[in-house]
Amino acid sequence: MNSRDSFKIVVLGGGESGVGAALLAQAKGFDVFLSDKGALSEEYRSILRTHSIPFEEGQHTEERILAADEIVKSPGIPDKVPLVKKLYAQGTPIISEIEFAS
């Protein structure tokens, strides 16, 4: 297994729990990136910037997401979404925000 600082976690979904998961991943020493297909609130953008957590909104950069060692997925993102199907097909572990926090 990779050391924590090189273990790549992508958080899919930038709502309250997604931003919380990104902060937790960073606090645990992981290399974290947050991606949201929609727009983030200004509050969440500010939190991510303050903590120097890279993020994107309005898109999912497939190449970056598929390179993750683990995905923390918002429950609002269905498993039938093509990107999630690709992640499952390549064997990338996908866990919920609640699982990650426990």
Predicted regions and their residues:
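N-terminal leader/targeting and accessory segments in enzymes
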Residues: M1-S96, F100
